UniProtKB/Swiss-Prot annotation:
Stored Pfam families: PsbM (PF05151)
Region spans: Disordered: 31-50
Name recorded for this polypeptide: Photosystem II reaction center protein M
Location of the protein in the cell: Cellular thylakoid membrane
Record flagged with keyword Transmembrane helix: yes
Lineage per the UniProt record: Bacteria, Bacillati, Cyanobacteriota, Cyanophyceae, Synechococcales
Topology of the protein relative to the lipid bilayer: Single-pass membrane protein
Protein family according to the UniProt entry: Belongs to the PsbM family.
Example of a GO cellular component annotation carried by this entry: plasma membrane-derived thylakoid membrane
Principal subcellular localization: membrane
Record keywords: Membrane, Photosynthesis, Photosystem II, Reaction center, Thylakoid, Transmembrane, Transmembrane helix
TM ranges: 7-27
Complex and partners: PSII is composed of 1 copy each of membrane proteins PsbA, PsbB, PsbC, PsbD, PsbE, PsbF, PsbH, PsbI, PsbJ, PsbK, PsbL, PsbM, PsbT, PsbX, PsbY, Psb30/Ycf12, peripheral proteins PsbO, CyanoQ (PsbQ), PsbU, PsbV and a large number of cofactors. It forms dimeric complexes.
InterPro entries, per database record: PSII_PsbM, PSII_PsbM_sf
Length: 50
């Protein structure tokens, strides 16, 4: 029972985290913030070492 529950949580996280990331990326794209995000990252604004 615990092993099945643990496996269910792992699979839920494995599917849920990328889904949340894609939804957030889609929302930012709909708001038109995706292009500004990539332009900022290419300038090294978000990553000081890059």
């Amino acid at each position: 029972m615990e092993t099945t529950n643990f496996g269910f949580i792992i699979s839920l996280l494995f599917v849920g985290i990328p889904t949340i990331f894609l939804v957030g990326l889609y929302i930012s794209t709909s708001d038109g913030e995706k292009s500004s995000f990539f332009s900022d990252s290419s300038k090294g604004k978000l990553g000081p070492k890059s």
